[in-house]
UniProtKB/Swiss-Prot annotation:
Name this protein carries in UniProt: Protein GrpE
One GO biological process term: protein folding
Ranges annotated as biased composition (Basic and acidic residues): 9-30
Gene3D superfamilies: 3.90.20.20, Head domain of nucleotide exchange factor GrpE
Subcellular location: Cytoplasm
Organism for this UniProt entry: Leptospira interrogans serogroup Icterohaemorrhagiae serovar copenhageni (strain Fiocruz L1-130)
Function summary: Participates actively in the response to hyperosmotic and heat shock by preventing the aggregation of stress-denatured proteins, in association with DnaK and GrpE. It is the nucleotide exchange factor for DnaK and may function as a thermosensor. Unfolded proteins bind initially to DnaJ; upon interaction with the DnaJ-bound protein, DnaK hydrolyzes its bound ATP, resulting in the formation of a stable complex. GrpE releases ADP from DnaK; ATP binding to DnaK triggers the release of the substrate protein, thus completing the reaction cycle.
Keyword annotations: Chaperone, Cytoplasm, Stress response
Similarity comment text for this entry: Belongs to the GrpE family.
Record-level Gene Ontology MF annotations: adenyl-nucleotide exchange factor activity; protein homodimerization activity; protein-folding chaperone binding; unfolded protein binding
Amino acid sequence: MAETSNNKTSEEAKANEKKSQSETLEESKLENMNSEESTETTQTESMETAETETSLQTELESAKKEIESLKDSWARERAEFQNFKRRSAQEFVSIRKEAVKSLVSGFLNPIDNLERVGATQTNSEELKPFVDGVTMILKEFYSVLEKSNVIRFDPKGEPFDPMSMEALSSEEGDQYSEETVIDVYQPGYYYKENEDKFTLRPARVRIGKPKS
């Protein structure tokens, strides 16, 4: 009986050992599976992170290129606008010059005629009031023109300026160190507004020149 009991105990011990080994093996398999799953998860996450970074980098480069393109476009638009403003300003000045010339030129010949009458020397008591009246009218004309920025100029004694004067005759002499206006046949007119100045009619003059 004792021997039978010992055999049973031995068999139970072996069974328990096998069971324990089986459980240990199962646990080892589970650990390996968990480890593999963890590794796969980590690799997947790393790949997703890398893909996300690559995508963000691509978007960033695209955004940079778009910004540079917008900067270039803005610079071109600004340059074109500045050119347009400059052309518009130049065209406006040109149109204004022509308008002023057209308006003033209609007054200049009558003014020239009145100046000739006003310069008439007379001892006639009948004509003197008329000449004085013409002189007063001329002064009013000059005042109106000046208020409109139109200036009359008589350059006698001044250096000759081909931009605002027209030499109709000349003479040479040792007394002249440079080309100088010695007589004015017809006064000139110019328009001036701020720093902008242009000749409406050149003064017609006689000049003295150094001997050649």
